[in-house]
Regions:
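ATP-binding glycine-rich loop module of kinase domains
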Residues: 19-91
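Catalytic-loop of the protein kinase fold
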Residues: 140, 148-170, 177
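A conserved short helix/loop substructure at the end of the activation segment
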Residues: 271-284
Length: 679
């Protein structure tokens, strides 16, 4: 079980409600999560909420959020919250993974204190007694503005301000913020609480944002509380977005409703769609403290004298045109094939400078992509029309400070993966930054993130590409490998443990996600092992690269004994041991490998099966033996040749001697015969 412990000042709570009979889940040895007691008012669009009891301090009223595995928690917020000295923010107590008996799988949970009162609205469809201006200032704005100042000091955004995530204390009526940890910034927000440019994006690509985005959400919250209801309940997000683009956010959200005369100019100033026209925290604080209103004066927008028509829709402004072009990308590509759009901007919008910029979207520049495509050109034109809007490229829409979460969206939706890669390679982020009328506080950080993503995407090998972006840029995301089958790994040692469990059944888990997770989360570099795996020409080389990778990860991140993984790799790499020529060395290595199996250290196995020194010694001595064998063979052959030659010479000499002896004997016989006759 893995967890990160966070300190929290303990707040006494009333008795917990009665628990139902489902089996409780024990987290971190003390937190008893009650799956049978659901807390719907604390749940979010990506997480479930359950009553939780602290075994050591049962008087504390807690709850557990069970997270969506595919939506990363805000690790920076989880770690930073404990250092924010403000009681208007609920702070996490503990988070990590837990075995969840209800589902038979592992889950990620965050333990939090329950809010000290009810939500301002139980849902965005609910109604309530409208708040007076005095209540809004005293109970809502004063504590929340002070909280935002403290968070800004820690460079942390809230991005979760809305009536359903704000709670009113039962003892003094002051407002407390709910959690901000379960999902990326802005992910849980209804689109109406987001500025237009972020509302255009899917929740996961809305971006980190800054204080200006918080003030917009405060403005919408003031409107809802001032009316006592959501003025656009039942209106779809797309319809509301279209209204906001054409009418402005304030008019589109308020509609025919009326706000208190003292509140209306404040809300209007907070809901300006141009960020530089929106009230700052200082402006809002001045109104709260003095009551004086200095409403911002928006610059009049440029509206065409005749509309641009596209697919049955009309646009009178540059932003409207940018928006409708994204509704049919292929049709929009045909529109930019000639100068029709450019001429409309020049003549109908009377904006020659922008028309010139559109004409320059095609040529390659020093900071542009290596190759210009029609898709990149169209994306540039859309950004030129609406520079403060999100980047729009084919089917992908994102704010530049959401490159990290966008990688998850791309990796889980293969049709979007190519969009993400081409968007980064096309240097759309650079172009977007160039077109900003005013710098953003987060632009430098976003640029650094984009550079990281580009470096990983340039390598398509295992452990790189889109999967590497996913884990490098989202540090709280668990490994998304489908092969884990219900296991959750937030840290490398947890993934090693999961692999060890699966290895007990003879299954070796390894895929692009697992490789990228290890590469991103392990202290030290494993790029060499990953490249060796990619370049492997056979299964043995691939297995050795895998073994070296896992051994490195185990040595850096885990004290776990991996006997099952050790056994699997030893079986797979047995042919490598058998390939040693020296029988004594081969037997010695096999003996060492079996002896080390009890420790389950993969590094020990690496030293045995991938020992370059011993392999060279074996090869060198084999070559020496081979040369000696060749020399001895030559000597034997020579001796054999000399023996045959001597045998032939001996036979020849024997024949000669035999002939000579025969001659002598013949002479002697004749002599004896002659002498016998004479005598």
């Amino acid at each position: 079980m893995s967890d990160a412990t966070l300190q929290l000042e303990e707040t006494p709570a009333p008795d917990a409600p009665a628990r139902e009979g489902l089996e409780e889940v024990i987290f971190a040895g003390r937190y008893r999560i009650q799956p049978g007691v659901v807390l719907p008012h604390l749940a979010t669009s990506s997480s479930r909420a359950y009553l939780t009891i602290d075994s050591e301090k049962p008087d504390r009223e807690l709850y557990a959020l069970v997270l969506d595995h595919q939506v990363p928690a805000r690790l920076t917020a989880i770690l930073a919250a404990k250092d924010i000295p403000h009681d208007a923010l609920l702070k996490p107590i503990r988070w990590g993974r837990v075995d969840w008996s209800e589902s038979g799988r592992e889950e990620i949970v965050i333990i939090l204190p329950q809010p000290p009162g009810p939500p301002l609205l139980p849902s965005m469809d609910a109604t309530t007694q409208y708040w007076t201006v005095r209540e809004l200032k005293r109970d809502f704005l004063i504590p929340i503005m002070d909280l935002l100042r403290r968070m800004q000091d820690d460079r942390l955004t809230h991005r979760n301000i809305r009536p359903t995530n704000l709670f009113r204390r039962t003892n003094d009526d002051s407002v407390v913020s709910g959690q901000i940890y379960s999902a990326p910034p802005g992910y849980e927000q209804p689109a109406m609480f987001e500025p237009i440019e972020r509302a255009m994006c899917p929740p996961i690509t809305r971006g980190i944002g800054d204080l200006s985005d918080e003030l917009f959400a405060i403005g919408v919250t003031l409107m809802v509380l001032g009316l006592g209801r959501n003025p656009v309940a039942g209106v779809s997000d797309e319809e509301l977005l279209q209204r906001r683009i054409t009418q402005g956010s304030y008019n589109a959200l308020l509609g025919d409703n009326k706000l208190h005369a003292d509140l209306a100019p404040v809300v209007r100033s907070l809901l300006r769609d141009e960020e530089h026209e929106r009230w700052t925290l200082a402006d809002l604080s001045n109104w709260v403290n003095s009551g004086r209103v200095n409403p911002s004066q928006p610059l009049p927008g440029t509206r065409a004298d005749r509309p641009f028509e596209f697919n049955g829709r009309t646009a009178f402004t540059a932003r409207e045109l940018a928006h409708i072009l994204t509704t049919d990308w292929n049709a929009a590509l045909k529109v930019i094939a000639d100068d029709t759009l450019q001429l409309w901007v020049d003549r109908s919008l009377n904006d020659r400078d922008r028309a010139t910029e559109i004409s320059e979207c095609g040529p390659l520049g020093a900071n542009g992509p290596r190759q210009m495509t029609d898709d990149i050109r169209l994306a540039r034109i859309i950004t030129t029309l609406d520079p403060i809007g999100p980047i729009r490229f084919r089917g992908t829409t994102l704010m530049p400070d959401a490159v990290g979460p966008a990688a998850i969206f791309a990796a889980l939706n293969r049709s979007k993966s190519a969009d993400y890669t081409d968007l980064i390679a096309g240097k759309m982020m650079n172009y977007w930054h160039e077109k900003q009328p005013r710098p953003k506080t987060w632009m430098l950080t976003a640029s650094e993130t984009v550079e990281k993503a580009a470096s990983y995407l340039s390598d398509s090998g295992v452990g790189f590409s889109i999967e590497r972006c996913v884990y490098e840029l989202n540090p709280a995301l668990p490994c998304l490998s489908p092969r884990l089958k219900g296991s959750v790994a937030l840290q490398p040692r947890e993934l090693i443990d999961a692999m060890e469990q699966h290895a007990a059944g003879g299954e070796l888990l390894f895929d692009r996600h697992i490789a990228a997770f290890f590469a991103a989360r392990t202290t030290g570099r494993v790029d060499r092992e990953l490249h060796d795996y990619d370049r492997a020409s056979n299964e043995a080389e691939r297995s050795v690269a895998q073994l070296r990778l896992l051994a490195f990860v185990q040595s850096k991140n885990s004290a776990s004994i991996t006997k099952n993984l050790y056994r699997m790799f030893l079986e797979e790499l047995q042919p490598m041991l058998d390939s040693y020529r020296n029988a004594r060395l081969r037997e010695e290595l096999l003996k060492d490998a079996k002896k080390a199996a009890a420790k389950g250290s993969l590094n020990d196995l690496v030293r045995i099966v991938d020992n370059a020194k011993k392999r060279k010694w074996d090869e060198r001595n084999f070559q020496v033996a081979t040369r000696r064998h060749a020399a001895l063979s030559a000597e034997i052959a020579k001796l054999q040749t000399d023996e045959k030659r001597l045998q032939r010479q001996a036979m020849l000499l024997g024949r000669q001697i035999s002939a000579n002896i025969a001659c002598v004997l013949s002479v002697l016989v004749i002599a004896v015969l002659v002498f016998s006759r004479i005598g």
